[in-house]
Regions:
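Acidic, metal-dependent phosphodiester-chemistry machinery of nucleic-acid enzymes
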Residues: 1-334, 338, 342-346, 350
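Catalytic core segments in nucleotide and nucleic-acid processing enzymes
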Residues: 315-394
Length: 394
């Protein structure tokens, strides 16, 4: 809670920063992608709580990284750090800065090192990647000082910090596509003409059902919910066959992975074109997994992975239909409206009177009312379902 400050290289070290592009050209891309993904994954992790005087104190794991990995001087006073860099709301690990750094890797990195997978990861490797991410933060600050774009700033702040419940996304999509969409008689006669069997179209195009798709994503989200509060010191790239070889539906899972993956070189052109758009992570949202071409895959972040439950799924469904079919997703909005109506009806219970959508206006010029209403005595609450995306096709 409160304002959180992202630190730059100059804030932490107070000395000239290394040349970012030159340093990127020297490092092993395969190793760097692994470290970036791992550091993003532990950005919100806490150390084991300290118990003192009948209370528990939670300390961000980031504090240990400041001390043990970067070796930042604590300047102890009465046993407590006086260096402001150790404040809990001053951060050296940032989702946005690491994703920007990842774009820089795709632009300026040495792609020949993607095949060099026989490496170890040391404390200095972690320190180097964090330092370069801090250089990125300085570069962003310099750019904003010269030319600050309020729209881009609000855009990125909203999308990165708005974190809807993943469980809510899963349940919503399952209810809409796994329940309501099964039978067009769930809808009024005037809506049935817009009906599309999205689950059948999805299965035909991708070879997996929407339910199987969501089950795969749930499995891949598990590592982000673990209690692991330490660095691995090994690659977090995972071998596809080793992970899924014992699965009954291995082939189906691999099909799901292929619809959500890209090789780093496939994202190069997008990264170049959007280098100056600090808010644009569309490429990572289209492909939340990276493939190294040697049978290994890497989840970029929990942020990009959770997006696959909603916005990414929407566009996968859209791709099941011709681009000329302008009404392909009209029924998708009807599904969302019905979902909101059912939620509102359930919320009414015995305390409120539920009123469904109805026609208003003169005969021949009718319009539909809001999607649902809740009434209690002489008070009326109107409920109108509106969905939107702050990015384009992700």
């Amino acid at each position: 809670t409160g304002i959180q400050l992202l630190l730059g290289y100059s804030d932490v070290f107070g000395e000239p920063a290394p040349n970012l592009i030159e340093e990127i050209g020297k490092i092993n891309m395969h190793k760097t992608l692994s470290i970036i993904a791992e550091l993003i994954g532990i950005r919100n992790v806490k150390l084991n709580p300290i118990r003192s005087f009948y209370c528990e104190i939670s300390i961000p794991f980031e504090m240990a990284i400041k001390k043990e990995i970067l070796g930042i001087d604590e300047r102890l006073v009465n046993g407590l750090p006086s260096n402001p860099v150790y404040r809990k709301d001053w951060h050296i690990i940032s989702l946005q800065m690491f994703l920007i750094f990842l774009k820089k890797i795709l632009i300026y990195g040495d792609y020949s090192t993607l095949s060099k997978t026989d490496y170890s990861i040391t404390k200095e490797d972690y320190a180097q990647i964090i330092r370069l991410q801090l250089v990125v933060a300085d570069k962003v600050e310099e750019k904003n000082k010269a030319e600050f774009d309020e729209g881009h700033f609000l855009y990125s702040t909203y999308h990165l910090n708005n974190q809807p419940s993943v469980a809510g996304r899963i349940l919503r999509m399952y209810y809409m596509l796994g329940n309501l969409c099964k039978d067009k008689t769930n809808f009024a006669a005037d809506v049935q003409g817009e009906y599309r069997d999205y689950p059948a179209a999805f299965l035909e195009k991708y070879g997996v059902s929407i339910t199987q798709y969501m089950a795969f994503l749930l499995w891949e989200l598990q590592p982000y919910d673990s209690s692991n509060n330490r660095l691995n010191y090994f690659s977090v790239w995972r071998n596809i066959k080793a992970i899924y070889k014992s699965s009954v539906n291995c082939d189906l899972l691999l099909k799901t992975l292929s619809s959500l993956s890209a090789k780093p070189e496939d994202l190069h052109e997008w990264a170049v074109h959007t280098e100056n758009e600090e808010w644009n992570f569309e490429g990572f949202q289209r492909a939340p997994f990276l493939l190294d071409g040697k049978g290994n895959y890497l989840s970029i972040s929990d942020y990009t992975l959770s997006n696959a439950f909603f916005e990414k799924l929407y566009w996968l469904i859209r791709d099941c239909y011709s681009t000329e079919d302008s009404r392909a997703m009209a029924f998708y909005g009807r599904l969302y409206e019905r979902y909101i109506q059912d939620l509102t009806r359930e919320a009414a219970q015995t305390t409120y009177t539920y009123i469904d959508e109805f026609l208003i206006g003169k005969r021949g010029h009718e319009a539909k009312s809001s999607d649902a209403y809740l009434q209690k005595e002489n008070k009326l609450l109107a409920v109108e379902a509106k969905g939107f995306s702050v990015l384009s096709k992700v």
